Structures are given as structure tokens and as C-alpha cells.
């Protein structure tokens, strides 16, 4: 997967110094940013021209000490045809030789008012997300009480209906049916809808519903981190379900572990309310309040008290 320079401009604000239609369509294929410090000093042994070239104060100040044709010759090497875009941070002055080198190689030249380290971080974060490998999973992704929840289960069990009820209760839909999952960083999993299904939910017997049109912009969200998973399964009296909540299940998506709660579904159970309770319980545990542990401590105290009174 690649990101075009135009995609970068659409997302992050820059002052465009030089660009052409063909240069804007150049693809950025890596999230690694190059700060050409050694290259400005003439050392090109490990130069990677396919990366974004970012000029900060150090690179710029050295460049300004090089005069005449030497500066242009040096910039021609740094601004190679393979380079997708060159960015100058801190609103630093851009010399005419840099513009000339950009024109020669047909490279977009940008200027930013941001500090170099912050701009580097913003660029890396954006590119890591956009270039991450996507995995498609079946389910409904919701934002419930600020927690990203992936609802899964067998086909026809009522995932979309549960999602619709949760939207009516004030929560936000991210994706229905197909969820594109990607690893945002080493420990964070995120999900987003397929573009064709954005803001849509399918209810058997009703058809496709445009959630944004019916419930407003506050009922949908473009993407969310996946903090927990909920698996809906048909109730089976022969099967043992976790009744205390002290045996959490862990599922793995794209090498990231996510805690999962399994909820049995049968007639008369209000699944959306149970999902809300599961999410609130998850949040409480994240904040250090564990109802299961409290119950177990009370039970232990009661047993000890009964033994002492005998």
C-alpha cells in the first residue's frame, strides 16, 4: 500500500513552494523519514532517496554555508528523482537553488511552520497508520463509552441489530459487516470501515440504513482503536459460561492481543444493555475497580469468619 504526496497534503497543512500534477502523484512507500545531515556534508553511502527528505535547522544551516554552484550540485544529489517530497521545517528560508533542484527532479517542495521533531513525529504517525497492512474481519465495530468494541459472532445472531440498538442509545458506529483492522503501533490495534460501507448498517428485513442520515453526525465515527472484543454466541445450557468474569479470553488480531468477553444470546436477553455493562465493567477494571476480585475477597472473608465462629 502506498500514499501519494497529494494524500499527505490533504491531511497535513503545508505551504507549497513547488509542485506539479505528476509530482503530487508520486508515492510514499515508507514511514521512515530521512534527515539528510551527513548527505549535506557529502557522505552518500547509506542515502535512501525513496524516503521523505526533511530539512531541520541543522541541515538548513549547513546548507546555507555552501555557496554558489556547490550548493545546487549538493541539493541535486539529495533531491533525487526517486524522492517523493522534500520538506523544510520551522518556516526556514528556502534558497533558489533548492527550488531549482526540485524543478529539475520534479519533486514537491514544501515548507512547514512546525518544529522539526514534532513534524517528524506527525509524519511518521500518519504514514504508519496509512501504510499499515489491513486485515478484514467480520463484525460490528462501535465506540461505546469511549471504548473501541469489536462485536463478533455467528452469521444471523444479531450483531448488526445490536449495533443499531447501541446507536439509538447514544453510542457511535464505526463499521458494520466488514471491519478493516490494522496495527497502528506495536501495542495498538485500530479499525475502520470499508469506504463503500462507511456509515452504513444492514438489518435483515429492512435493508441498508444510512446511520448518519437517520441519527446525525454524532452517531458515526471514522475509525477507533480496538480496546476489547465481544463475541455473541447462542445460549447452550450444556455449555459452561464464565459467570464470575475471572477467566478472561484473549484473542489476537495482527499480532496484537485483545481481551474478549463471550456473551450467550437467547430470547428475552437485552443484548445491547449487556454489551454496555460489559464495556463499563471493562473500563472499571482498567481504572482499578474489579468487582470479581471484590466478591472473591468478601467470600474469603466470610469463609474465614465462619471457620472462626465454629
Swiss-Prot record:
Gene3D superfamilies: HprK N-terminal domain-like, P-loop containing nucleotide triphosphate hydrolases. ATP binds at residues 153-160. It catalyses: [HPr protein]-L-serine + ATP = [HPr protein]-O-phospho-L-serine + ADP + H(+); [HPr protein]-O-phospho-L-serine + phosphate + H(+) = [HPr protein]-L-serine + diphosphate. GO terms for biological process: regulation of carbohydrate metabolic process. SUPFAM superfamilies: HprK N-terminal domain-like, PEP carboxykinase-like. Residues 264-269 are annotated as: Important for the catalytic mechanism of dephosphorylation. GO terms for molecular function: ATP binding; magnesium ion binding; phosphorelay sensor kinase activity; protein serine/threonine kinase activity; protein serine/threonine/tyrosine kinase activity. Disulfide bonds: none annotated. The active site is at 138, 159, 177 (proton acceptor), 243. Its cofactor is Mg(2+). Mg(2+) binds at residues 160, 202. Residues 201-210 are annotated as: Important for the catalytic mechanism of both phosphorylation and dephosphorylation. Keywords: ATP-binding, Carbohydrate metabolism, Kinase, Magnesium, Metal-binding, Multifunctional enzyme, Nucleotide-binding, Serine/threonine-protein kinase, Transferase. It comes from the Bacteria. Its EC number is 2.7.11.-, 2.7.4.-. Catalyzes the ATP- as well as the pyrophosphate-dependent phosphorylation of a specific serine residue in HPr, a phosphocarrier protein of the phosphoenolpyruvate-dependent sugar phosphotransferase system (PTS). HprK/P also catalyzes the pyrophosphate-producing, inorganic phosphate-dependent dephosphorylation (phosphorolysis) of seryl-phosphorylated HPr (P-Ser-HPr). Both phosphorylation and phosphorolysis are carried out by the same active site and suggest a common mechanism for both reactions. Belongs to the HPrK/P family. Homohexamer. HAMAP family: HPr_kinase. The Walker A ATP-binding motif also binds Pi and PPi. This is HPr kinase/phosphorylase. The lineage of its organism: Bacteria, Bacillati, Bacillota, Bacilli, Lactobacillales.
Amino acid at each position: 500500500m502506498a500514499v501519494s504526496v497529494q494524500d499527505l497534503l490533504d491531511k497535513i497543512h503545508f505551504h507549497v513552494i513547488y509542485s506539479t500534477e505528476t509530482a503530487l502523484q508520486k508515492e510514499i512507500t515508507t514511514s521512515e523519514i530521512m534527515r539528510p545531515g551527513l548527505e549535506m556534508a557529502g557522505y552518500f553511502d547509506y542515502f535512501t532517496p525513496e524516503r521523505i527528505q526533511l530539512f531541520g535547522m541543522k541541515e538548513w544551516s549547513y546548507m546555507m554555508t555552501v555557496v554558489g554552484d556547490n550548493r545546487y550540485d549538493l541539493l541535486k544529489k539529495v533531491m533525487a528523482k526517486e524522492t517523493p517530497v522534500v520538506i523544510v521545517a520551522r518556516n526556514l528560508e528556502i534558497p533558489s537553488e533548492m527550488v531549482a533542484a526540485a524543478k529539475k527532479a520534479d519533486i514537491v517542495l514544501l515548507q512547514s511552520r512546525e518544529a522539526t521533531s514534532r513534524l517528524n513525529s506527525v509524519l511518521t504517525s500518519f504514514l504508519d497508520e496509512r501504510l499499515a497492512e489491513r486485515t478484514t474481519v467480520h463484525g460490528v465495530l462501535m465506540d461505546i463509552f469511549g471504548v473501541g468494541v469489536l462485536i463478533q459472532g455467528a452469521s444471523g445472531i444479531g450483531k448488526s441489530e445490536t449495533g443499531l440498538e447501541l446507536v439509538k442509545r447514544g453510542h457511535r458506529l464505526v463499521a458494520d459487516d466488514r471491519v478493516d483492522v490494522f496495527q497502528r503501533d506495536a501495542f495498538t490495534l485500530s479499525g475502520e470501515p470499508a469506504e463503500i460501507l462507511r456509515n452504513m448498517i444492514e438489518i435483515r428485513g429492512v435493508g441498508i440504513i444510512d446511520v448518519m442520515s437517520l441519527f446525525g453526525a454524532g452517531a458515526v465515527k471514522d475509525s477507533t482503536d480496538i480496546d476489547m472484543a465481544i463475541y455473541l454466541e447462542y445460549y447452550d445450557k450444556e455449555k459452561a459460561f464464565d459467570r464470575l468474569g475471572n477467566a478472561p479470553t484473549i484473542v489476537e488480531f495482527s499480532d496484537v492481543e485483545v481481551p474478549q468477553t463471550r456473551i450467550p444470546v437467547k430470547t428475552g436477553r437485552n443484548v445491547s444493555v449487556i454489551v454496555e455493562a460489559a464495556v463499563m465493567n471493562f473500563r472499571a477494571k482498567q481504572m482499578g475497580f474489579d468487582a470479581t476480585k471484590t466478591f472473591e475477597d468478601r467470600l474469603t472473608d466470610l469463609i474465614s469468619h465462619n471457620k472462626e465462629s465454629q
